[in-house]
Amino acid sequence: MTGTPLIYVVAVERSGDLLGAALMRSLQAKTGGEVRFAGIGGRAMAEEGVSSAIDISDLAIFGWIDGLMAYKRVKAAVAASVEDILRVKPDAVVLIDSWGYTLRVAQGVRAADPSIRLIKYVGPQVFATRPGRAATLAATVDRLLTILDFDAPYYEAHGLPVTFVGNPTLERLEAGDGTAFRARHAIPAGAPVLTVLFGSRTSEIRRMFGPFARAVARLRQRYPGLSIVIPIADPVEADLRARLENERCFNGAVLVEETEKADAFAAADAALACSGTVVTELATAGVPTVTSYRLGWITWALARAFNLMKAKYISLVNISADAELVPELVQTRATGANLAEAVGALMDDAGRRETLSRKLIETTARMRGDGKASDRAADAVLETLDGSTGQ
């Protein structure tokens, strides 16, 4: 193409916001700054110069019931997003996360202006649930950039060009300094440290805070010198801080911002984490982790009734390794007692922690692929603008 391309990036969750920002940096580098951006995103994309066209704070939604409850809000956001994209008239739109919202935005843009190239960055996990989404996506966008090397056949069967770029999560977390972290926060060198991560969605905080709090209460009784470290995610910061202040088991917990997360991981003996991108980040840092998740009960019942949950595991690390390197306690198993027992099994066995740490690092190294994922994604975006699908 000729001229300076305008690329519109859409991300509504914290992880997608970080992916969008990394992609923008790579596009800037590869074009020598000869690229313009607009979009919808959060703090990370704002730092790269994108003033979000809409407020994304209420759009990070997971599950059918949460989706129904937020239907009017999401419908209005979709309409506003499509209107802004058509007003800006970019050369391409890169849609990163939140399947229901981004799909409807893509469909709206395609219907109104087929000349705008549509690129999905990170596809829905059709290998795990609802394989029909592959055909839906293939009928809507021009190209898929996938972070999983086994994703492609599901989409290519429907004629969608797919490019495996690797997982950018694995490149953005730098090696931390656990010793310096302990010194900064007055944590003794030999004291056990548990990092607790509640999730980045409001619904995750609502469902996981209780079980995690009960687990931490049990663990603090079992390990009197246990230090609790809690990284705070931007979209849910106010809600989480308010809950922590009212829960005695978190008295004295160390709350850290994103800038200290790598050091916090390096200082941790183990982690208790809501399932999501952060589990991959913890694995990259070699932190033995227990992960957990709860869907709304109606959503869970429907998923089981219609056999929609196809995958053996829920975390990408376990799926990639085809082994439960990260213990998963989901739905009815996600109780304070069960979580405390699983974390305690890690805390009590230094040899097991060392073995798991090594296997987690080896697995995420394989997931990373060759080179830098954000650079490969940027190459694919530029190829699409030039009319190539890389096939």
Question: What residue ranges belong to the model's regions?
Answer:
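Nucleotide-activated sugar donor-binding and catalytic core shared by glycosyltransferases
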Residues: 1-391
